[in-house]
Amino acid sequence: MSRPRSPVARSEPLAQQIARNVENDIEAGRLRHGQRLPSSRELAQEWDVSVFTINEAMDLLAKKGLVVSKPRAARTVNAPDQEIRGEVRPVAPQVVMIGGYAGSGKTELGRILARETGWPMLDKDTLTRFVVEAALEMQGLSRNDRESETYLTKIRPAEYDSLLEAMTENLQCGNNSIVTAPFVREFADEGWIRQRELLCRNLGAQLTIVWVYCDADTMHTYVRHRNAPRDATKLANWETYMEGVDVDFRPPVPHLVIDNSVSGGVMAEQARQLIDQLTSNSKGK
């Protein structure tokens, strides 16, 4: 069980926040069909909420058929159709760049899309994290530093260069790519986006920009749930961190928005609508 977390944000119903987070983990394949869930008491300690709130969240998931609870037995994940689907092959290769603030759910969206389509998923943290941590330590910095001038000016640009090289190599091989990273600076720069559009077009591919919207309190819940060491500074200074976050930000070019707030639609359903739109656009080219 992970270490205790700070209290969950209270502006949205707590049970709904927890249920949505668990549902996203099921759809993203992090929680597998038949997997045993921790007890209500363990989950309550993990989320720093009451057992009653956990039971409410589990009831919401049970009503959707995502969790099964039997008398005197542990709750288990119920997702029998969770196996990866056959690969979706659009006419033209597709590149889906997914951006969003920390805790917005962009990686979960990428995983859901990858499971639905069979397309490669290129996540910045997965591809670069261990190298970044080693580089930071060589500079005498904490491996979890993501705020220093050294990280922002020297290491972060190299992370994105590596990510985009991996994307380009897949395109050169005729493969689709799902690319996930914050992209906050990049998506604010129209020139940067146009350069990537040109690169994709020259390789016979179509680029789609996706921004994951999430309200501040739900982002806080997701960051806590992730419980990653690199988020420690954000969590310890959350209000200060949020002063630099514009939840209403949108890229200055045509793009699609996925709403991952509690009041938004189910992420998996939004992901499937996105796939339909991508394949439809590809056929029309």
Region roles according to the model:
Residues 151-203:
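Glycine-rich phosphate-binding loop used to anchor ATP phosphates in small-molecule kinases
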Residues 36-47:
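A short alpha-helical element within helix-turn-helix/winged-helix DNA-binding domains
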Residues 1-37:
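Extreme N-terminal segment that seeds HTH/winged-HTH DNA-binding domains in transcriptional regulators
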Residues 202-223:
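Conserved phosphate-donor/acceptor-positioning beta-strand/loop module used by diverse small-molecule
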Residues 2-3, 59-96:
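HTH-adjacent hinge/linker in prokaryotic transcriptional regulators
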Residues 218-270, 283-285:
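Small-molecule kinase domains that catalyze NTP-dependent phosphoryl transfer to phosphate-bearing small molecules
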Residues 111, 115-158, 168:
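Conserved substrate/cofactor phosphate-moiety recognition/catalytic segment
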Residues 105:
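Conserved glycine(s) of the Walker
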